[in-house]
Amino acid sequence: MSERHLPDDQSSTIDPYLITSVRQTLAEQSAALQNLSKQLDSGQYQRVLNLIMNCKGHVILSGMGKSGHVGRKISATLASTGTPSFFIHPAEAFHGDLGMITPYDLLILISASGETDEILKLVPSLKNFGNRIIAITNNGNSTLAKNADAVLELHMANETCPNNLAPTTSTTLTMAIGDALAIAMIHQRKFMPNDFARYHPGGSLGRRLLTRVADVMQHDVPAVQLDASFKTVIQRITSGCQGMVMVEDAEGGLAGIITDGDLRRFMEKEGSLTSATAAQMMTREPLTLPEDTMIIEAEEKMQKHRVSTLLVTNKANKVTGLVRIFD
């Protein structure tokens, strides 16, 4: 097998026009979005939002080709933000998957031209089922638009593609419309971060919102007694690898903590640490977290007080562990 040589990016010569083309494409798509915002029919959008709010089934997206890819994304966004939704391929629907659709479902059909054959073939069956239809199209006079209960027009002059063929601007506008509908429904449903986390338990946000500090805390808390020497404190902080040490009273309860910062501040104030005890260096009544505190609340508290480690306590106010902001 011959060795494959990758081109050296530094030695490649790029026609400056290509960079100009990139800027022009971004500018044209940005202008198209601005134009859509200015020309949108508020009455049609209000009707669409009412249809979505009152839908007792699923909001089903369908589209062919690139429109289908965008439809999948819109459906995924709706589903993850509290609006039950799925995507159905129009060709597959016409060959049996119509059985997935109930009369309670709302259909959003995507076709820039409004004349996509596979989409139009679905319309008679959907009307026979009694489904409401929303069209996203660039042609308000198209067959699809005329058969829809509500029409969201793209108001697009041309595709960004120099040949005006590849779906570019139309897919950007359609995606933006989908996001706009999803965000509007988030406001309508008062969809909060906790709700979002329920649908994203495997993601970072879901973990932070659904996980308690007790689930992730470290149980081995480095500790010293009130009369511990400076040397002992340093040894426990170093061996504990937490940048802090808990100071225990005679009954084993929490008397305070000593952090790296406490040591520096004490040294700046006193000048010498050789004869200091833990009781002299510690911060009394340190911040703590109950075991049932959610991770996101712990992070907020740490950021507010500019600390990276907090001790965790149980209902009896006994220290049971510690949690770091990056755990």
Curated annotation (Swiss-Prot):
It catalyses: D-arabinose 5-phosphate = D-ribulose 5-phosphate. Residues 217-273, 282-327 form the CBS domain. Belongs to the SIS family. GutQ/KpsF subfamily. Optimum pH is 7.8. This is Arabinose 5-phosphate isomerase KpsF. Zn(2+) binds at residue 89. InterPro entries: CBS_dom (IPR000644), CBS_dom_sf (IPR046342), GutQ/KpsF_isomerases (IPR050986), KdsD/KpsF-type (IPR004800), SIS_dom (IPR001347), SIS_dom_sf (IPR046348), SIS_Kpsf (IPR035474). Substrate binds at residues 82-83, 89, 95, 121-130, 155-157. One of its GO terms (biological process) is lipopolysaccharide biosynthetic process. The gene is kpsF. Residues 48-191 form the SIS domain. It comes from Escherichia coli O6:H1 (strain CFT073 / ATCC 700928 / UPEC). Disulfide bonds: none annotated. Keywords: ATP-binding, CBS domain, Isomerase, Lipopolysaccharide biosynthesis, Metal-binding, Nucleotide-binding, Repeat, Zinc.
